[in-house]
């Protein structure tokens, strides 16, 4: 009898801690980069086809002022070109071909393609990206059918997040960190952020609980294997970034 009561208590506690599929956010990482070349319109479309409600993309501001969707500092590994992405002008970017024959899109290209069907997590990869990105999302919110609450702005560059908050008091912000997740709490509080996004390998149950106690969501990256996905759900995180979104949906 005592054993059955104990088992029941454990099951109840586990169910209280674990996020269910209804409140667990699966974010397509760079679209669905496990299937299609990352940060391309095709990759974003693949993630949408798989059923995500949010996609994460990375952006840089290039030398000619445009905001392009790309992850690496240099174009060498993913394209037929070479050099730092921030040093390029738009004609240089248009001349590049990504793996799989894709092209590097501008942020506006992705917004036009998505057309408000899902939410978008825009990670500010490069310096001096906040102002231009804010200008773009405000325009699309006011004039192109998007809602501001469909955007989340995240970055490891906390100074860029500070600039974004100065420019836009309302847009949702998430603080990215690859270090101790608890160290991000003061910045999240300063920014009025909605979430802290830590590397899953640095995440502990204590950290998840502490972040939740402060009122922030926990969206952790990049979780691809079934065992790790199950572990994150059991720890009560609010969502994950995943290269293969269908594995977690």
Predicted feature locations:
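Sec-dependent N-terminal signal peptides
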Residues: 4-13
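Phosphate-group recognition and catalysis centered on beta-loop-alpha active-site segments
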Residues: 14-249
């Amino acid at each position: 009898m005592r054993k059955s009561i104990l088992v029941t208590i454990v099951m109840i506690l586990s169910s209280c801690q674990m996020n269910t599929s209804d409140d667990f956010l699966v974010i397509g990482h760079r679209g669905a980069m496990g299937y299609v070349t990352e940060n391309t319109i095709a990759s974003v479309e693949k993630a949408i086809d798989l059923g995500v409600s949010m996609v994460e993309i990375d952006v840089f501001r290039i030398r000619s002022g445009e905001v392009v969707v790309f992850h690496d500092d240099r174009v060498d590994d993913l394209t037929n070109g070479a050099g730092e992405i921030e040093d390029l002008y738009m004609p240089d970017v248009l001349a590049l071909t990504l793996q799989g024959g894709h092209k590097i899109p501008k942020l506006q290209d992705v917004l036009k393609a998505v057309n408000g069907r899902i939410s978008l997590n825009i990670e500010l990869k490069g310096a001096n990206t906040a102002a231009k990105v804010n200008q773009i999302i405000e325009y699309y919110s006011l004039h192109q059918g998007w809602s501001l609450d469909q955007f989340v702005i995240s970055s490891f560059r906390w100074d860029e997040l500070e600039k974004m908050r100065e420019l836009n008091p309302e847009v949702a912000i998430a603080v990215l960190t690859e270090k101790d997740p608890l160290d991000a709490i003061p910045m999240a509080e300063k920014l009025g952020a909605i979430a802290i996004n830590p590397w899953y390998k640095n995440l502990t149950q204590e950290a998840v609980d502490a972040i939740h106690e402060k009122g922030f969501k926990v969206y952790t990256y990049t979780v691809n294997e079934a065992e790790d996905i199950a572990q994150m759900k059991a720890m009560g995180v609010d969502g994950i970034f995943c290269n293969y979104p269908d594995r977690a949906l």
